[in-house]
Amino acid sequence: MAEITAQLVKQLRDKTGAGMMDCKKALQETGGEMEKAIDWLRQKGLASAGKKAGRLTAEGLVDSYIHTGGRIGVLVEVNCETDFVARNEAFRSLVQDIAKQIAACPNVEYVSIDEIPPATVEREKAIAMGSDALKGKPENVKEKIVQGKMDKTLRELCLLDQPFIRDQSITVEELIKQAIAQLGENVKVRRFVRFVMGEGIEKEEANLAEEVAAQIAAKEAPPAVVEAPVAETPEPAVAETPEAKPAATESKPAKSKSAKKKK
C-alpha cells in the first residue's frame, strides 16, 4: 500500500476537484492508487463536486416536512444556481430527503461545523476538560482526549456530518455532493428550523403515588360537622302608648224654671 501523503491527496484533488477529505478517503479505500481513487470518487459522484462548490446559489426551494402524528415539523431552505434545477424533480426529492433527515435528528442545530458559535465550542471544551476520567492524566494526553470528544460532540450538532437516513454508509454532505455531480450545479443547504410540539412549555409532572395517597386520605376522612346557624329571635315590637287626652269637665244640668216656683 502506497503511503498517503499530503502531496498525493493534493494531486487527486487537482485532477478531480473533489474535497480534500474525500480525496484522502478515496486513496485510503483504494490503497493509494491514483486511478482507482479517481474511479472511486466518480462512483460516489464526488469527482466534480469540488469544482462547483464556490458558485453562487441564488435559486432553490423552501420545503417542509411534517412527521406522522403532527408532533415534529421541519422547514428547510436548499439553494441551487438556476431556477431550472430548482424545478427539477431530482432536486425537489433531495430537498425532501434533507427535511426528513432533520426531523430524524433531534440534536442537529447547525448546517456545518463552521456555523457553531465560538461560545458553544468553549462551553463544550470546558465540559470535556472537567470530566472525572481525565483526573491524573498528563496535559498532552488530556488535550488529545478532549479534542477527540469535542470533534464527536460538535459533529453531532451538524447536519452535514450526519449519516444519511436512507443509506448509513454516506453522510448528508456526501449525499449533496452526489446531487451536485448529478445536477451539474452547486447545491447548498442554507438554513433550517425544526419544531417539536410542546417544546419549551414546562409541564407539571404529577406524582402518581402522592396523588393516590391523597385520594385515599380524602375518602377515609370523617365528614366535617357543620354547625347549623342559630336563628336570631326578633325582639317584640313595643307598641306606642297614645298620649292621654284631658278629661272633659262634666257640666251640671240646669234647673228648670218650674222647679224654682215650687220652692
From Swiss-Prot:
GO MF terms, alphabetically ordered: translation elongation factor activity
Location in or out of the cell: Cytoplasm
Name of the featured protein: Elongation factor Ts
Role of this protein: Associates with the EF-Tu.GDP complex and induces the exchange of GDP to GTP. It remains bound to the aminoacyl-tRNA.EF-Tu.GTP complex up to the GTP hydrolysis stage on the ribosome.
Chain intervals for the UniProt region annotation (Involved in Mg(2+) ion dislocation from EF-Tu): 82-85
Keywords: Cytoplasm, Elongation factor, Protein biosynthesis
Biased composition (Basic residues): 254-263
Stretches the record annotates as Disordered: 221-263
GO cellular component: cytoplasm
Main location per the UniProt record: cytoplasm
Biased composition range(s): Low complexity: 221-251
CDD domains reported for this sequence: UBA_EF-Ts (cd14275)
Database matches in InterPro entries: EF-Ts_dimer_sf, Transl_elong_EFTs/EF1B, Transl_elong_EFTs/EF1B_dimer, Transl_elong_Ts_CS, UBA-like_sf
A matching Pfam family: EF_TS
Family: Belongs to the EF-Ts family.
Lineage: Bacteria, Bacillati, Cyanobacteriota, Cyanophyceae, Gomontiellales
